[in-house]
Design a protein with these regions (language model features):
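N-terminal, positively charged, Ser/Thr/Ala/Gly-biased leader segments
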Residues: 1-32, 46
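Polytopic transmembrane helical bundles with strong interfacial aromatic enrichment
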Residues: 8-11, 69, 77
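Interhelical loop and helix-boundary elements at the membrane-water interface
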Residues: 9-22, 85-94, 132-150
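Short hydrophobic alpha-helical membrane-embedded segments
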Residues: 23-26, 93-103, 121-124, 145-150
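Small-residue-rich segments of transmembrane alpha-helices in multi-pass membrane proteins
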Residues: 28-32, 84-87, 146-162
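Membrane-embedded alpha-helical segments that form the functional core of polytopic membrane enzymes
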Residues: 28-36, 40-72, 80, 104, ...
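Multi-pass membrane catalytic core of lipid/isoprenoid biosynthesis enzymes
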Residues: 72, 79-119
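Membrane-interface helix caps and helix-loop-helix hairpins in membrane proteins
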Residues: 112-117, 134-142, 161-167
Length: 170
């Protein structure tokens, strides 16, 4: 018996570990903040928007991957989550951490290339989601309140990427 992994299964597990559908919807929130914050579109604006979209996807995907490592044992017990790559054993936790770390680095580099504040918001979002919200989910319903903060950051990230500043408008 050979243990082969197809490119399709790697792709599908990558989509699952990053929660691609959720990540893309969060990216749209960043794009909305960017569009509302930008004064006018130029050719260079599209380049910034592309870096925001890819960097934002990386940050959300990294958060989701870290989350699945942290919650692997709990995920394995629930019907809704037991088939996730780490919980099911298709992906080793260390592989998921490497994927999440690479996404974090790429996301931070892309966001920093827009402006340092964008990278800061990306880093804060990952920290709040993985280090505060995820552990609180099993302890208190107040985790929903805490989760609202990383949930609001993508729009602010888009605004900061467009304007270079964080103000009351965001």
């Amino acid at each position: 018996m050979t243990n082969t992994v197809s490119l399709k299964s790697i792709y599908l597990d990558f989509k699952a570990i990053t929660k691609a559908g959720l990540a893309i919807s969060v990216v749209f929130s960043s794009i909305a903040g960017f569009v509302l914050g930008i004064d006018h579109f130029e050719v260079s604006t599209w380049w910034v928007l592309l870096k925001l979209a890819i960097g934002g996807y990386c940050m959300v995907g990294a958060s989701n991957a870290y989350n699945q490592v942290i919650e692997k044992d709990l995920d394995a017990l629930m019907d809704r989550t037991k088939n996730r790559p780490v919980a099911s054993g298709r992906m080793q936790p260390r592989v998921a951490v490497v994927v999440a770390s690479m996404l974090t680095i790429l996301g931070l580099v892309l966001l920093y290339s827009i402006n340092p504040s964008s990278a800061m918001f990306g880093a804060i979002s990952i920290f709040l989601y993985t280090s505060v919200y995820t552990p609180l989910k099993t302890m208190t319903s107040l985790s929903v309140f805490v989760g609202a903060f990383p949930g609001a950051i993508p729009f602010m990230l888009g605004w900061v990427a467009a304007t270079g500043e964080f103000g009351i408008e965001a």
